[in-house]
Amino acid sequence: MNSSNNLYALENPEIENAFFFRQALNAISTPGKIFDLSCNLNTPNGLSKSAGSLLLCLCDFDTPIFLSETFNTDEIRKWITFHTNSNFTEKGNCKFALGNWEELLPFEKYQLGTDAYPDRSATLIINYEKISNNGTKLFGPGIKNYTYFNLPDEEKFKNNNSL
């Protein structure tokens, strides 16, 4: 574990999980804004506190998860199973996918959802070290005026929008 050898991820689960959930909602509703999830979350080696907090507050026994090769370790699988009771699956059947950018491609392998049921699409939790507010200009719903965000591959995002 990163912070300690304690199996339990949170010291105050109700309060900390509410904080994570609020931060996740803020991030989803304001695309391109960077949120700091500083916390005392105990995660296994290789799993960031940000990714771990998202998994804890968004996944449960009814949430199939895909783990890319880097994250598909016994330690990470056991931690996710212990805290969420989620099961693991392939890209095409997951509700959440965790991985590095290149390992999660291509986007076409994931469930897309529809206009009527957008919740049926997969959510990708991308481990990306070089996050910053410069690069591609973003605008649209949830963004006042515009913002900038360094996307790993702008063309892949544009192509994904047309799926």
Where are these regions (language model features)?
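Internal, well-folded beta-alpha domain core
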Residues: 74-163
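N-terminal, charge-rich interaction modules
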Residues: 1-64, 68-71, 82
